[in-house]
Structures are given as C-alpha cells and as structure tokens.
A protein has these predicted regions:
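Structured, non-catalytic alpha/beta "coupling" segments that mediate domain-domain communication
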Residues: 52-61, 166-197, 438-464, 554-568, ...
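Acidic, turn-prone loop/beta-hairpin segments
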Residues: 5-24, 250, 275, 351-352, ...
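Residue patterns forming the tRNA-binding/recognition surfaces of aminoacyl-tRNA synthetases
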Residues: 1-44, 99-253, 288, 318-320, ...
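Catalytic cores of enzymes that engage adenine nucleotides and/or redox cofactors via long glycine-rich
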Residues: 171, 227-232, 236, 240-249, ...
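A glycine-rich phosphate-binding loop feature that marks nucleotide/adenosyl-phosphate handling sites
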Residues: 7-16, 171-181, 246-254, 343-350, ...
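NTP-handling and nucleic-acid-processing catalytic cores
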Residues: 1-132, 207-237, 286, 294-308, ...
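Metal-dependent nuclease catalytic cores in nucleic-acid-processing enzymes
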Residues: 112-123, 156-159, 321-337, 605-612
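C-terminal low-complexity, glycine/proline- and small-hydrophobic-enriched intrinsically disordered tails
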Residues: 439, 566-750
C-alpha cells in the first residue's frame, strides 16, 4: 500500500474518487471544437477537443514522430489561447496522424491518456479544477470559481470573439458518469492511497485456474480472468464521511505511520509530538474484501475461524465479481493462505417485467416487503417518488405506477415470493419479474394448505390411530414419486438448478399429490367399509404429506414448519424437532413397478375424461368401460383389485376385459391396448347426428369468416401482430374442432 499523486475518476457531486467499475459510459451528442494555438514562428497549429474548458491545463501539444508535416516544428512553442502561457511541442506515438490535424493538446492533470504522455515527457501536472468541478485560481481570473460547463460556454464565446475557433462540428462520443451521482466524472489529480494489486492478482488468478474456487455458471470465469489479467493498481482511499478511516497518522513533518491506534503508533515509533490522523476513508470494497476472515476474529486464531473458514459457497451477482469476489479472493489468499470459498454461485439481476433494470430513477423498483405484506397505492407512490435524483420524472412515474398497480399491491406472503425466485433462478440469466408469477405461487401455497385441510377433515370424520400403515398401491405409488423427486432435486440443487428442483416439486405436489393421490384417497376412504383400511389410508396420507413438507421445506420454510406442527398435533404425536433437522424426504422408497401400474390407471382415467370432453353427448353419463385383452394380465389384475376406486373417480358403471367391440362405440387407442365405450342406450343416433352436423356447419362458417379476414392484405399489414396471431390461433382451434366433429359423425354413420 502506498500514497501517490495520480489521476483518479472524480465525482464532483460527492467530491470523492470512484473506481473504474463505478463509472458508467453513456453515448452523447456534443460538439467538437477546432482551436488554433498561435506558434512562435508567427503561424498556428489547430487541435480538436470536446473539452475547451481544459485548455488552461494544457502543458504541451503532441504530434506523432512519423508525421512529416511537423518535423520542422521541433523548436517551436505555442501560446495557449486566452493566456500568455507557452507550451512545447512533443513527439509521441499517442498522437494519430490520420485524426484531424494530427496534433493533440496534452492536459496531463485532466485526461488519463495525457497523464501517461506527460510522464513520458516529464510534463508539468497542472490541475485547473476545484473538487466541486469549478475552475480554480490556475485559470485566468475571469473564469475562476465558475462551474466547468458554464465556463465552457464563456470560453468558447471568447475564443470565437478573438478568432481562435477554426470550426465547430457536431460530434458523437461516450462520456463517463458516476453510477450513483449521475454526474459527469472528471479525471482529477489528487493524492490518494493505492494498493499494488498485480502480485495479489496472480494468486487470485491461480486458484480459479486450478479449480480451488469454481464459478457457477462456469462462463463467469472468463469475465473474472478478463478483469484480473488486466488489473491496475487499486485506489483504496475515498473522500467521504462514511467508511473505515484509514489507520495512518502523520507527525508534524507529514511523515506517515501505520498502526491500530494513535497510542499504538506512538508506542511503536516513540513519538511525542502532535499526530494527525488521515481524513480519508477506505474504499468500501477494500473493507469488504476482508469480510470472510475479519468477521471471524482474525488476526486471532480461534475456534470460529477454524470452523467457518473457508466457507463452501458464495452467492452473489455478476455485477460485483470484480468489486467484491475477486478482491476477497486476493485478500484472503494473501492473509490466510487459503481461498475464502470453494464455489461462487452467480445469480442474475432481478429486472422488471419488461426487462428493464430496477432503479429509483425509472420508478420501477419493487420492495420485497411490499410483495410479502402488501402496500397501498398511496404508499407505493410515496416510495417511488420520494427523494428522487431526477424530480422531473415524478409525474411520469406516478402515471406508470397507477396504471400498473391501480389498487396498490396485495399481500402474497414470504414463501410465495421465495418460491417465485427459485422458479426463475436459471443459471446466469437475469430475472424479468412478472407479478403474475407470484400470484400463481400464492395459489400453490393455498393448494398445500387445502391438502392439509383435506387430511384434517378425514381425521375429524373417521378418527385416526397411530401405528404401522400396511402397504397399499396408492401409498406405494405416492412414496415412489416422492423418492424419485427427492433424488432428482438433490441432483439439481448440487448443480445450482433451483429452477428445475422447484419445478419438479411443484409438479409432484400439484399434480401427483393434490390432483391424483388425494382424489384416489378420497374415493378409497368413501368406499371403504373396513375401519382398519380407512385408518391405513389416512395414515398413508399423513406420512406422505409429511414427506412432501420435508421436500418443500428448503423452498417454503414458513408454511412447511407451521403445517408440520399442525400435522403432529393431528396425528397426536410429539414433534421432536424442526424439519430442517430431519432428512430430505428420507422415509420414502422407490417402487417402480407400483408407480408404473398406477400411472397406467391414471392414463386410463385421463383418456376417459378426454373422450367425455370430445363427446358432449356423454359428458355427464355413466357407462361401462371395455378394455381390450391386449392389456397385460398383471395390469388387468391390478385394475380389478382397484376397480371400485377407478369406477368412482372416472364415473363408470363398471369395467370389463374383452375383445368383443360393440358396433356403436367410441374407441381410444392406448399403449398396446384399446379403451371402448359402448354407446347403445346412451344416445339417440339420429338426434346426435343432427346435433353434430349443425355444430360442424357452425364451425365451418367460423373458419370461412376468419380465413377471409386473414386473406385480407390490408388487415395483415395494419393490425397489430398480436391480433393477427390471435386470429390464426382461432383458425387452428376451429380446424381441430372440425376434425373432431367429422370423426364423431363418421362413427355414427352406418
């Protein structure tokens, strides 16, 4: 660590140095000024600049040593316009002979490239700005104290009036802005503290290359190396009130001393006179780089440091890989001789639903607490418009917010929000946050509560005695589904695929458990006339639901912990621990055979429901189901054993296995066998034919009207794309319906 006079990015609003990564480059339209500098031989040379206010800081004009136009200018000096000060000509490869006149003004104290040229030619470093961006007393008195941009206008007018302007052109360029202040950043000459980062970076590069620390997704390692391979010395001092004050004390001769305190410095160096502590504070990221070990009692070696260092995983955003991640690795490797963490998981940024980065200036910030607890429109407007850096945008933000949230934001709950983020957490991708998603996961939370209420109702209606539950196909099927989901989820989580893990659990809970297992159990309990069997079915519900809660717990800790307590009370057992202390759906086992058997029964019931939907005439009828003998005898036996439950769910009169197919029937081909529904006695063929033909005629007419609209070139060219696509979808749906009706008519024809 050393102190030096150097150029830094200076934020004139906050009056502090900022790092390169805190600078945002913006494309702007400005003007470029061609200014004539009188020469000592009676002529002049023209240089171009977009910052005429910096001419008072010029200390040379540079041309390329290969530029033949200026070989005779070696001993000529130039006078800075509006002053009497002369500056030399220097030959430097920084100047491009192909750009403009080939001559550039060199202002070492106000341009990073010029600073390097100045070092090569031992030029004076002339700072002409105050820390607030106004011109200082190194400038002509007419401009002293003026804001830099006000001074620009006055200087350009004076240059024009005195004939120093050759021409002015419109010009597009990029200008640096402070990411927090949104003001133009100035290269500014100050005394700052620096950290020589090159040696530190070598170790930090090595640990990632050799796999001691890994990035997930791995493509972020490339970004890490790009920064680290081109690292510059790090300016670690800041001119702010907040932060760790730099532990340096100066004596009366301005000699610096480092120490833990003034007392430590005096004792270490035997100092008696007055000491003054450094006013600057450390860059936040310098302090933060010590986080992994400084918070654990370092430099003392203690149990906490040994236990928790290094840690396993750092979860962070890509925008602070260099700010924080790289610097933690550098510092920890230097001081602790080990890596701070073994894995770095990079999340995406959470943006608004249209993909815009959330910011106060855009008025699109969503506070997670407001999504959890809800917020009124009035409160939301206050949050989005209070203390704005750009108050002129206030009305626009109010209008936009009222349109998006006319009633404010309703309460969605913590677990619904948490699950939403899990579901959107695809590796390395930014998240476009759509409030519709959190509504869906609030419904999911309600679904879980309703599942518990169903179990609670069964216990209330039938009672429940704890004990060993005997095996049954429903419980074994559900247990196997839970087991497989748990296995898959553990794999996904190890790979940081929280989106895939949450999707699998969602499917398990909503479809397998709530839609099928509960429905099967409801019918099985209704049809049971055996108290032990009923108790067994309820016990299986409780066991499987607890396993569901274990699976859900990392994703929904609040709801699952609450429901696990209620479940224990329901079963009249003592809850011995929190879910987090238990396993990950540990009590389940795989049973592929049973799983496949009940899956096939579900396929049969689903097929019957599709047939009902496609044939409105039998939608609400009960009927016998015929299954062809192509179905395996083992599967026929399983269906027969569970016929009462299947009949109850599918609303059938009965099930029989035969190859005899009635003349009037509906057939559905399954995987290697057929489902047949006899129609005799269910419908009047003539009436049904008339109904189907009328419906077909209506559908054909709809197709004709929509197709005519889509054939109209004027409609296609003028209508919004979404409207055109909607009409195309209507045609597609109508064509599908037409095919279905024609198929039904064909079945009724002799």
């Amino acid at each position: 660590i050393y102190k030096d006079q150097a150029l830094v990015n200076w934020d004139t609003k906050f009056k502090t140095a900022i790092s390169d990564l805190e600078v945002v480059s913006k494309d702007v339209s400005t003007q470029i000024y061609y200014i004539k500098y009188p020469s000592s031989d009676g002529g002049s040379i023209t240089v171009a600049t977009v910052r005429p206010e910096t001419i008072f800081g010029d200390t040379a004009i540079a041309v390329n040593p290969t530029d033949q136009r200026y070989q005779s200018f070696k001993d000529i000096t130039f006078t800075i316009p509006l002053t009497s000060r002369t500056i030399p000509l220097v030959f430097d490869e920084y100047s491009d002979p192909e750009m403009g006149s080939g001559a550039v003004k060199i202002t070492p104290a106000h341009d990073f490239n010029d600073f390097e040229v100045g070092k090569r030619h031992n030029l004076e470093l002339l700072n002409i700005l105050n820390d607030d961006g106004s011109l200082n007393d190194k400038c002509p008195k007419d401009y002293v104290g003026m804001d830099r941009f006000d001074a620009r206008k006055k200087i350009v007018k004076a240059l024009k009036d005195q004939g120093f302007i050759e021409k002015i052109e419109d010009y597009k360029t990029t200008i640096p802005y402070g990411d927090r202040s949104n003001t133009i950043v100035e290269p500014y000459l100050t005394n700052q503290w620096f950290c020589n980062a090159e040696e530190l970076a070598k170790q930090a590069i090595s640990v990632v290359r050799n796999g001691e620390t890994e990035f997930f997704p791995s493509n972020w390692e490339k970004t890490y190396f790009q920064w680290m391979d081109n690292i510059q010395d790090w300016c670690i001092s800041r001119q702010l009130w907040w932060g760790h004050r730099i532990p340096i004390w100066y004596d009366e001769s301005n000699t610096p001393y480092a120490g833990f305190s003034e007392e430590d410095v005096r004792k270490k160096h035997g100092l008696k006179g007055e000491l003054r502590q450094e006013d600057d504070v450390l860059d936040t990221w310098f302090s933060s780089s010590l986080w992994t070990f400084a918070t654990m009692g370092w430099p003392e070696k203690n149990e906490k440091l040994n236990l928790f260092h290094p840690t396993t995983t750092l979860v962070t955003g890509f925008d602070i890989i260099f700010f924080w991640v790289a610097r933690m690795i550098m510092m920890t490797k230097h001081f602790m001789k080990e890596v701070p963490f073994k894995e770095v998981y990079i999340t995406g940024l959470i943006k608004d639903e249209s993909g815009q980065k959330m910011s106060k200036s855009k008025g699109n910030i969503l506070d997670p607490i407001d999504l959890i607890d809800g917020v009124s429109l009035e409160e939301l407007l206050t949050k989005r418009t209070e203390g704005m850096m750009q108050p002129q945008l206030k009305e626009k933000i109010i209008k936009q917010t009222k349109k998006q949230f006319p009633e404010g934001i309703e309460s969605y709950g913590t677990d619904a929000l948490r699950y939403t983020f899990y579901s959107l957490a695809s590796p390395g991708r930014d998240i476009n946050f759509d409030i519709g998603r959190i509504k869906g996961y609030r419904n999911f939370c309600n679904k879980i509560w309703n599942a518990f209420r169903f179990i609670e109702m069964q216990v209330a209606n039938h009672g429940y005695q704890t004990g060993e539950s005997s095996e049954n196909i429903l419980s074994d099927w559900m247990g196997s589904k839970i087991f497989q989901t748990a296995e898959n989820c553990q794999t996904h989580i190890k790979q940081y695929r929280f989106d895939l893990a949450s999707a699998e659990i969602y499917e398990l809970v909503w479809s397998n458990f709530c839609d099928w297992y509960i429905e099967f159990s409801k019918v099985a309990i209704q049809k049971s006339d055996d108290a032990n069997q009923t108790n067994n079915l309820i016990g299986s519900l409780i066991t499987n639901f607890y396993s569901i809660l274990e699976l859900l717990h990392p994703f929904m800790p609040f709801i699952t912990e609450e429901l696990s307590s209620k479940l224990a009370d329901l079963a009249e057992v003592e809850k011995s621990s929190f879910i987090i202390e238990g396993g990950f759906a540990h009590a389940r086992a795989s049973n592929k055979e049973t799983e496949q058997q009940l899956d096939e029964i579900i396929n049969i019931i689903s097929a019957i429901r599709v047939i009902r939907a496609e044939n409105q005439n039998i939608k609400n009828e009960t009927f016998n189901l015929i299954i062809s003998n192509d179905l395996s005898s083992e599967m026929q036996s399983v269906i027969s054993k569970n016929e009462s439950v299947i009949v109850g769910i599918a609303k059938l009169d009965g099930i029989q296995f035969t190859d005899k197919i009635p003349l009037e029937s509906i057939e559905k081909t399954m995987d290697g066998y057929k489902l047949i529904i006899p129609l005799e006695g269910l419908i009047d063929p003539e009436e049904e034919m008339m109904r189907l033909q009328k419906e077909l005629a209506d559908v054909e007419n709809d197709i004709k009207i929509i197709s005519s609209k889509l054939a109209n070139e004027q409609f296609i060219s003028k209508a919004p794309t979404a409207v055109v696509e909607k009409e195309k979808a209507k045609v597609s749906d109508a064509e599908s319906k037409k095919a279905m009706l024609e198929k039904s008519i064909a079945k009724l024809q002799p």
